[in-house]
Structure formats: structure tokens, C-alpha cells
């Protein structure tokens, strides 16, 4: 799909090219107050009051998400006009904008339009410029057009015909909007990779498959990939990671992916992604109902790989290292048992009270490994706890950090990227719940504050660098009729790196 940018100040009579240019449809926003302004006012004038008459007749009330097509409109070059309800003008915020653009894309994709002129990006949204609106609109469109068909014997072809979108933006935002197009396409491509990896079944997306995916990203985008096997992991003394992997016939992999966009001496940001490609719970076996969704337990790894692809496509001037410990968590005669004690790469001993709290066991060794890069910051991403889903639901990812400045950067990025996160507590008092009579610490801290104690466990392995943890158990995938991976938190991570790179 092709996206282009055209500057236009509708209030200054600069709309002639839009009014006369050939297009299958021009998209206009209407507030509930039904007062026309900007593009809608110019189009109304050019069509001799058609939009005003439609509103007066009651066919478009401006309620959020409502759409109405006007066909064979005279006075303009577009063969159709799509009116999109924006809701109340004084309540028009990021969510209202996203609702409006999503409604517009759904309406357009149900038709046979090929080329569209899109004016909604110029709407005032929380004092954001139109380049932000362009990026959000492209991501919304790519979200609507994403389909996972790789495992179908006869994949259905795309039903829409849309091929080209021309965005009208404020002239002062034209240059930034062109950058936004590039970033949005790269982000969408990274999110699609993340979704594809999550949606693949566990018998396809194995640890070896993730390792090969990292190698392909490296080959396609000029990165450096290292994929360590069992013997190399053993040599590193990653006893905690290996305690999870030991009962599976699938060999574990430890993936390290390097992107160098800045000077070699510049400290990298390290992203660590949990890569449990299927989680049965091990000896602490999960209930059978819904266990199929445990193929999504590698979505932390998928989001890190998707972010690396997006960063490479954007060409960010920053150094980034991705680390992915990946294995299956299976029961078996040689599986780790509740009560077993294992030794981490750091040397700390861990009493494994529950083998279904395995994500932290593979992440802790990866976080120790990250020290060798002398990182500027480390962010781990994991579908870590059901407790985080109970606390935050499916809207916000849980953010934990021992560094207030880093947490602030991530929260700012989450708002800019429309990929919400909520900071959770990480007080020292919670550490007491991880005490063990027999080892340095236990891998669980009981039912109270389960998401917090999981993050507290990880914090024991992050004392030498600024660190944050994103628990995406509630946001990485959806269940029900819309079942599938979401691609989150690729937008948040990518925006954080864009901000760090100053781009």
C-alpha cells in the first residue's frame, strides 16, 4: 500500500488540488455540534451546501464512529465523500481520534475504493501535530488489514482494493509527516512480524524457529545475530534457564541480536524478551482449558524481534541489543520438580516452588548476561503473570522499574505511541515475600501482589544498570472472537528508542 503526504491549509483556500484531484473518496470528519470547519467546510462550499443539507436532514449526527457515504458528488474530483462522526468536539482526544479513523478504514475497506484522500490527520487531537495523526492512521489501517493465513490450506485473498492513501496535513508538518509515514510503515511491519510469531502454533514456532527468525532479520537488515545452543548455554552456567528447558525435546536457544546505528562506543539499550514457545506449566501443570493460548507465552520474544526489525527499517541512530532466552516448559521424567533448587548464572540459588513461574527463571539469566554490554538501559518484556491481567486487564501493560527517569521515558513513549502502560509499585517491602528457608530466594511470593513479586524477583538480577520490566500478559494477545496476537508493545518500545535516538 502506498502512502503520500500533501500539505494544505484549508482555512487559506489552498484546497484546490484536493477539490479537483481525482480520487475514489475523500474522508471528512463531522463533530456532534455539526459545525463545519476546515476540510469539511471547503468541500461543503464546493458542493454547494451538500454536506450541510445532509446534516440538516438528520442523516449524519456526528456521533463517534458513525459513517455515511455520499455518492456521485458534483463539484469535486472525488467520486465519493465519506463522512465520519467524531463525537463531541470538547471531548475529542486520542481515543476519539483512533475510534474515528478505525471506523473510516472499516467503511472504506468494505468498498471497492482504490485511492483515498484522508483529511482526519489535521484534526486537533490533544495539541498533537498532523504527523502524529498520520502515523496513528496508518497503524490503524494496517491493524484492520492484518490477517494471519499462513496455516490455512486455502488462504482467502484480501477482500479490499485500497492501494493508495493521500494524507492532507498542515503545511508546517509536511516534512515531519513524511518521516511519520516511514516510521509507521516500519512499525506496522514489526508488529506484523510479532503477531505472526505469536499466532503460529507451538509445533511450528519452536525455539529453533525463533533462532532462525533472528538470523533472517540479521541477514535482511544488516544486523549481527548469535544463536547459542545447549552446550554454549551450559558453558555460561545458566542453571536457572536450563531448569525450565530440561524436559522438552526441543533444544533451548539463547538469541542475541545486535543493531548498531550509532558509534560503536555508545552504550546500547538492551531489550530482553521472554521466549517460552509453549508453556504447559511443567510439573505444576496448567488446567487443560485454554492451554492452547500458551503458545502466546513467547510474545515478549516476538515483540523484541519485531521491534528490532522496525528499528532497522527506520535506521535509528542508536545501538540496540536484543536478548531472547527461548525454550518450552514441559512435564517429563527429568523435569524440574517443585522444591528443587537451581543455581542462576549470577550465582544466586533459587528454590523452585512452582514450575509454572518459569518466565522469571529464564529471564534472570538473560538479565545477568546483559551486564556484559554495559547497557544504557535494559528493558525486559514478558507475558509474566496472570496477576497483572487481574490488576490491569487488557488495556495497560504493567510497567515496573527501579529507575524513575527510565520509567518516565517509557510512560511518555506509551502515551505518544498510543500503547498504554501503567507504572506498578516495586517497594522493597515486597522482597520479603521471596524469602526461602533453603535457598537465596524462592521463585514465587504467594498470591498477594503476584505481578509485583515477580518483578521483585527480576530486580535481584538488575542491580548494575537502569532497568524496567513490562508485564504484557494482558496486552500481548486477545481471546474470544478476535483471538490473536496484538503486536504490542512494539509501538511503545519503538517510540522509546525513537526518542532516545532523537529522531
UniProtKB/Swiss-Prot annotation:
Stored InterPro entries: Leucine_aapep/pepB (IPR011356), Macro_dom-like (IPR043472), Peptidase_M17_C (IPR000819), Peptidase_M17_leu_NH2_pept (IPR023042), Peptidase_M17_N (IPR008283)
A GO CC term assigned to this protein in UniProt: cytoplasm
Example of a GO biological process term: proteolysis
Annotated positions binding Mn(2+) 2: 274, 279, 297, 358
Source domain of life: Bacteria
Presence of keyword Manganese: yes
Keywords: Aminopeptidase, Cytoplasm, Hydrolase, Manganese, Metal-binding, Protease
Cofactor note: Binds 2 manganese ions per subunit.
Catalytic machinery residues: 286, 360
Keyword NAD: no
Catalytic reactions on record: Release of an N-terminal amino acid, Xaa-|-Yaa-, in which Xaa is preferably Leu, but may be other amino acids including Pro although not Arg or Lys, and Yaa may be Pro. Amino acid amides and methyl esters are also readily hydrolyzed, but rates on arylamides are exceedingly low; Release of an N-terminal amino acid, preferentially leucine, but not glutamic or aspartic acids
GO MF annotation terms: manganese ion binding; metalloaminopeptidase activity
Membership in a protein family: Belongs to the peptidase M17 family.
Protein name per the record: Probable cytosol aminopeptidase
Species this chain originates from: Burkholderia lata (strain ATCC 17760 / DSM 23089 / LMG 22485 / NCIMB 9086 / R18194 / 383)
